[in-house]
Amino acid sequence: MKKYFVYIASAVLMMAACAKEDINTPVETPVVGETEFISIELNPATRTILDGTNTNWSAGDAVGVYFKNESIGTLTLVEGSTNKFEGEIESALLLGQDKVTLKYPADVTAVPTTQVAVAGSFANGAALLEGSVRLKDLRAGEGVTLNNETALLQFKTPVAGDVAFTIGTTTYTVTGCAANTTYYACVDPAVSGKLSYTVGLALGGKEKASFSTEANKVYDLGALTLKESMFGVIGNTGDWGDKADIKMYETTGDNFYVAYGVEVTSGFKVRKAGVWDNNYNFGTTSATAKSANSVVGVYTDGGSTDINVTNGTYDIYFDRLAGQVYIMTPGNSHKVATQPTAPGNYSLAGSFNGGGWDDTVAMKYSGDGIWTNVQNFAANNEFKIKIKGSWNSSWGADNVSPGSELVSNSGGNAKVKAAGTYIVGFYKDGNKITLVKK
């Protein structure tokens, strides 16, 4: 992708009058404890609201005055004015020849890593300006230029959410972005390295192995893309037979996927690659409609029930390893959903475990009568499922494949023919054990 940039107008502080230095001016003596009132006009109006490539001051803006990195005062935008700043500075022990530094924002020394989204602009106070001037020139009305110390990343996101850009080891997050709207992220030009991004939990579809910026430039990243997974949502989002699966995106989590803004009418399932393969056909056990912000236990089997939900628009998360689907109000994190309470204690025991058959591994309760566990098996390892850690209630199967029927309580050992890491699913009431490679 070509790199496009435009220059941001620098903020120039102009005084109303200029005073010429008299070459016979006597040597100045600093006055201990001296403070003085400064009133300046910043022309043209500059800085915090982006309008094309021009920027303007906004209510509440303040410029900090520093001497040798120590704050000596603040000049604040006068209420009702567009360019007049006033305030007291501590000029004790300072000479007119001493240089002071003006910084905007007054109390910010680094580009903030969390910035609130502003449509067509960037967060108030996120772009830094800095310039130096002799104290005598500031008093006399000589000009000072504030240089833009930040770079801007221009972007649009395909879905609503928080957009986080990582450059090297530093991450800048723009919160509350709407879909298909132009935003700007402020970044420190000193930061460089690999560029990647996320939207919510979804991984960005493009990366740059090496990325750097310069102050006072805008870098147009264009319309961001997201990394599509092999999984999708299919069902009463339209016509089961004719409508294409709604793509789920890969996320920062292992085997964890998300589809944003899915409009659902009644039921749906999650499947892989747009085909009905029993290894990757995820449904649940109950036809009862779920409400928003619910967690649904799922397992992979052609005979599973559709995931029914109250009609609406949702962000749908799929945790394949835990056997769970989250049905969330758009914008809500899946973490706010309440996890289901397990009605019992289920565990795996078998020859896969170094501790032997009496050493058990707990299974996670997914919800809706389903338990799961991710386990490494060697070829021909065997296992059974124990209830409450007792061999009095243990379940096995003569053959383990998607939708295998359980033999019975105290049935035969389930054998895994090929070595690998597997997701074990157990649906007791439906007499099902499922085994699918991770």
Where are these regions (language model features)?
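C-terminal motif of bacterial Sec signal peptides marking the signal peptidase cleavage site
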Residues: 15-17
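Solvent-exposed serine/threonine-rich low-complexity stretches and specific carbohydrate-binding patches
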Residues: 69-83, 169-179, 213, 245-251, ...
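Sec-dependent signal peptide recognition
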Residues: 2-8
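Insoluble glucan recognition modules
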Residues: 19-45, 51-56, 143-144, 148-150, ...
